[in-house]
């Protein structure tokens, strides 16, 4: 596991999240002071949330990068697909983009937290983590209110660290959420 924490020093951070689950995870970590930056260093979305839902790079640049910030910007993407491209327009190519992957799905953290690993291993080739969790715990696992109540900061950190031990990285350059933790 490599640490990428130092990349965020002296930067304004844009946290782009694939969906609601990723948003809640990142907001919980930010609220708990577990990320290498504070809420004061984050670009907020139009509702003043410290995370931004995923959007095409061109739209993201138009909406957020044409504004003036007190420090250089760094983009932190949290998503499950290592194949998704995110190419900023030419005028913004000097902005660093760091991707943290939660493949195959972020619901994998729930499986680890609930200690369902042995059951999951038996069905993982034919069942998505989200479907596996919906069958066992709650059909609302993608809803923000449910996720906010489900995850404590401590449980979330433990699941993220457990994931880093069972996850097979596709390459040395692949980062996970554990790389952001102290």
Regions found by a protein language model. Give the residues of each.
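Conserved SAM-binding loop
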Residues: 15
